[in-house]
From Swiss-Prot:
Protein name: Xylose isomerase
Organism this protein belongs to: Rhizobium rhizogenes (strain K84 / ATCC BAA-868)
Example of a GO cellular component annotation carried by this entry: cytoplasm
Family annotation (SUPFAM superfamilies): Xylose isomerase-like
Keyword rRNA-binding recorded: no
TM spans (from-to): none
Family according to the record: Belongs to the xylose isomerase family.
Domain of life: Bacteria
Gene field: xylA
Amino acid sequence: MSTGFFGDIAKVKYEGPDSTNPLAFRHYNKDEVVLGKRMEDHLRFAVAYWHTFTWPGGDPFGGQTFLRPWFNETMEAAKLKADVAFEFFTLLGSPYYCFHDADVRPEGKNFAENTKNLNEIVDYFAQKQADTGVKLLWGTANLFSNRRFMSGAATNPDPDVFAFSAATVKTCMDATHKLGGENYVLWGGREGYETLLNTDLKRELDQMGRFLNLVVEYKHKIGFKGAILIEPKPQEPTKHQYDYDVATVYGFLKKNGLENEVKLNIEQGHAILAGHSFEHELALANALGIFGSIDMNRNDYQSGWDTDQFPNNVPEMSLAYYQVLAGGGFKSGGTNFDSKLRRQSLDPADLLIGHIGGMDCCARGLKAAAKMIEDKALSQPLADRYAGWDSAEGQKLLRGEYSLDQIAQWVEAKDINPQPKSGKQELLENIVNRYV
């Protein structure tokens, strides 16, 4: 049943690359087979509940620009928002969605009321999922917006805030589990500091380790089969965030013995803020065995802010999905659009247009990446470059069969005097451009 919010807009369909219809897909054909799998099953698109339905359109210099009929803290408004959201998922053809607890329920006066409100809306969502076939990619807790979290959640100097945060995560994990969510995400927006003058770094890192262990223990207790995912970000809103990037989070997981329990949800915009390319973070996560899922967006490269715009750069998407496919593709993860409209994009249709463009961009990137993999366009040059390490002597070096002094004797005896070889960067860049 239509809410009327989207007027007479029909379900978005694939019309092919020659279409000029802004409310049609030009490249995303969910049933097209790519590398033996349907495109929908490769990409596993999800809509972010927060940016799509709760963001008011503000910025640091101005307030709300979006006037949504569900913008008030009542259960009636929360259910109207859910009606519009699931209508949107159906119109767009998105197989998944994601949410924070604070996105979907009205704020209560205490923890008990928050839990009651969340449980009520979860029951409502369960019926919506049954009616539409839309599934939950992941759930999470908002532990950063309310003023109680201004000094952190897990890393707060007040143990009562730690306890409140842990209890909130417990209820959100229960909600995610009940709705059949395939992952549970932790983003530490306030887990960091503004100044070291009032921060005990070791204590806060120990607190964060204990918190994450509690989450993993509870996952196993309730039989949740999805992945626990951490989402790295270097700063914003804190000056320095503890889950800075993939490498930092891996070190934290190793320190706490959780590298086999927790994987990462990697966002394109956060990678850029950390001074990395998106594909670097994806490749490193795959190399370390902790890749889980992605948040898809882009930043304005001039502003230096995390602007959360819809992706529109096909070459970037091609290299990103190349790393995803090279690592074996998504398991329980997917492509969540952590993207929001610009504050001047006021029309309901703009919500669809933004997602359509992003989905088309990702689809083009996926197809280019798949073709590069099929043709071994990058993998063969890479294998040739490292071929020496596959030789008998190279493998002995890696296995530790030679000591340092034995290696020195070997180099002298064989008169080894290696000469450098071209890295062929320009050729490889030109090869990529053939596909995009």
